Amino acid sequence: MDYNNNRYGGGGGGSKFNLGHIVGDPFSLATIAIATAGWLIAFVSSIIANIDQEYPNYSWWALAYMFFVILGVTFAVAANAVYTYHVAMVGFLAAGLVFTTSSVNSLIYWSDKAKQAAAAGFILLSMVSIVWIFYFGSQPTASHRQTIDSFALHKDHAPSRASRHMTQSYRPETTHSAQHPQMYNSSQLAGFETSSPVTGYPGGAAGATKRESASAFPPPGQGGNFSNNQQPNPITSQNNPQNQHQQPQDLTSPSTTQQPTEYPYRAKAIYSYEANPDDANEISFNKHEILEVSDVSGRWWQAKKENGETGIAPSNYLILL
């Protein structure tokens, strides 16, 4: 399934900056606040330590680097674009973790209180970096991410319909989309059937003469009525073994009746989904709802709800149980 969902913070990077995404998410609010506090402690302590004695230049670079990392994480969360940039975020955080831990090692053993305070700020930055790497580096379907995201207000809304642009060839055949050819028996055709095999030519079978075509359809002026010797008897046509051999098989016969769909799998909705009103095949479901699934090979799964409603659902909204 195309995995760019607003639910995971994947609005394609085009969402506007909204502080409500941070305020409404306790995890993001707490970690960004701790990271900002740790950076301020390290920055102020570094200035004081640099006045009294020499300060490692490497730690200044670590401070500048982590400043932009915190800004980047804040922007990604506020713009609801975490899923779009989560790979880059994990990479930058991993490099920042190396910088902050190295700064801690170069400052923590000094007797100067300012340098020790700066080391404490870098320790806070290192701890937040580890938490962010574990969170942003995990799949949205991970249990710890689902637990954390359940406290966020904005992550309970229905995502954008970008996932509906999936290739329709992956959609399973349903009763709404499948179209069966209409079949008629000889009694319904009432003389309009032909004994020649149908080849797709508008005049009937290839090589058919004009006389044969004229016998099937009366010429104009006769009102479309058949004479007594031209109109076949429907009962005789049905009882004739030759006509039974030629007439197409009716859809109501047991051999062509569509077998009921089986649902051997069970899936849990990790997020709510609202069906497209223009597509009668889709179904809506709520977060944590249990669905029965018949096929899990494509991007769209044939699913059945507890109330008996059936339809297709995007696979990236479901997780198999």
UniProtKB/Swiss-Prot annotation:
Residues 238-249 have a biased composition (Low complexity). The chain crosses the membrane at residues 29-49, 59-79, 81-101, 117-137. One of its GO terms (biological process) is regulation of actin filament polymerization. It comes from the Eukaryota. Residues 1-28, 80, 138-321 are cytoplasmic. It is found in: Cell membrane. One of its GO terms (cellular component) is plasma membrane. Plasma membrane osmosensor that activates the high osmolarity glycerol (HOG) MAPK signaling pathway in response to high osmolarity. Forms homooligomers. This is High osmolarity signaling protein SHO1A. It comes from Hortaea werneckii. The gene is SHO1A.
